[in-house]
Amino acid sequence: MESELFQGGVLMHSYLRAVGFSKITKRSSIEQIIMDVVETYDKKIVIEDHPDGVFAEFSKNYGCDCGITVCGQYDENNVFYPDYYFPFFRGTGITTQESVVIERHAEKESFAGACDDLRIGVTLIFYLQNAAEYLQESRKSGMLPGGQPLTLSGLAKEGKILFPVEKDKEAVKAARELTKNRNHLIAAARNGDEEAMESLTMDDMDTYSMISQRIVTDDILSIVDSYFMPYGIECDQYSVMGEILDFMTFKNIITGEEICQLTLDCNDIQFDVCINKNDMLGEPKIGRRFKGIIWLQGQLHY
């Protein structure tokens, strides 16, 4: 198999550092890594009946469940031309089984996904990791059902470790009940229930009043336990803060840079985040909180 590099060179990806390539600053260096992925891949999927030719996706791990994916096309002479690449981190477990909508990006054969989860309160938009697998399945069965299991994960360029908010068991139990009731109200409101809408409005007003009073004397991070909200103008980037349920560290097999994998509970959603240890301020421990900006990725399971 032959391969050619990107026409006009290759751009640096801003989240390469999250998977242990923080010192990659030259295009020639990332081109070598891309060639390494194509030639010594861990996983390869080829779509031969693609409208534009033969589409191929190569993935290689450079750490624990994290690495680089390269996508492109073969020409009639079996020469592979990379179109784009991206760093990935595959999370653990199933984050949600809500209905997911997938749409192709305009400029290349990559995809974005959108999912409404009542626990977050906003539409989650993520970058689809397994584009080739999605293309395979959609060609097999036409329109895919909307309830595919979804695993979300995040790559972080920077983050901080915060102390936890002190809570007693009764307060935790009461908060879970309130969250459960609120999710039922949101579901009802989406179906046009006016009483549910009014109840949610009153709850929001009470919350605003409570925060307005406490913000005078308390720090905002002691009032807000966790959050998950859009960040900047790129639709798949989020500012998150959540409790650390588990963590582990490992090294990039090429650079030796230490990477930290954190399992977070954020607004009752559990997902994993990957960050270069040099970009994280503080020492992670179970029960503490992580606060940072993430690029949200998702993997659909078939």
Locations of regions flagged by a protein language model:
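Short coil-to-beta-strand transition motifs
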Residues: 231-243, 288
